[in-house]
Amino acid sequence: MKYSNIQFIELSPNSPLLINKKNITFDCENVFLPVGSETKDIICVGNNGKNEIKVQFTSKEQNDKFLLRVQPPLVALEGGYACEFEIFIQPLCTCKIEEKLSVIGFDMKEGKEIIETVTIKTETEMTTKIDPDELVQEKKIGEGTFGIVYLGIFRGNKVAIKRMKDIQDDEDALIEFEKEIFMLDKFRCDYIIHFYGAVFIPNKICMVTEYAEFGSLQDMMKKEKNIQIRLFMKIKILIDAAKGISYLHSNGILHRDIKPDNILVLSIDESSKVNGKLTDFGSSRNINMMMTNMTFTKGIGTPTYMAPEILQQQKYKKTADIYSFGITMYETFHWGECYPKLLFKFPWAIADFINKGQRRERPDNIPEPIYKLITLCWAQEPKERLPIDSIIEKLESFLQSC
């Protein structure tokens, strides 16, 4: 040590162990740590005593938010000598890290243990991998086959926290979840619900999105049964949802689960730029679950929004999304179910009706031109259905005449 230009400091009075710094920062003053990959820092430990000391670093307990390893794991230091230790950290989420790291020495001659501490003090870059401690869960606002949705707060914003059911025990579901998160992270569209991020830590897995004050279009239909939402607002919400579908389709993505339940209403103010937003896209796992049970007897779902070609187990294409949007338009303008239980007692009756090429007739509360547009969306032949941008044009012309 006496030939080194490294400045050593005492860890505590009378301790034979010296160190070059008490805080391990990974150069955090200049660079935020990347999430999901390792960053290295170096710390020097010296033996200022006469006896040989075995030195190692240990953390008190396993941490959910980062992985830590030290190289070399153990060194025998003779008196007057020092050694470099490499500290590697891999953050698993966006977080600030302040953690005590024990420096444990064992005097071989005297059989005495020396315990000192240094501090890891660093911060990561901002990512969509969320620190669960930043989420404040307030109250339950919904539940489905996927899990439970809570209202919460994340960095001062009202958010929806979707906690997944038993996902950590299902490897396929976890892979599907990660794929969906990867896709959501890339979306930049005003008409798709804003994605803040997700928690990947086992037993805390959840997705965090923008909170929609009015819930889904489906929620509004149930709650506002006796309050008629103006035709203008119905058209506007559907235009917004169609713009979300257009964004997905132009990027080669299929929604696969378009229905009033997956259109969220953020505002019913007619002057708002955006009133409705799409959510729950790419839910191929929902489709797969339904396809394995085409008789619809186990309560997994109904074929209400499924195009005839999907019921016949053909490949899913953009036109199947258009069909689903046609049924969604029917229910929105009618402000009720397309296939009420009174007329369709069993889910297979709906599938049978659709496969025969039959469709619901125009109810009195759907104007003729709008019903004509709906029929162009739910045509039996996929190639006869309108592309989404043509639907937007027609809806916008209806809006102008309101």
Can you say where each PLM-predicted feature lies in the sequence?
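Activation segment signature within eukaryotic-like protein kinase domains
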Residues: 237-238
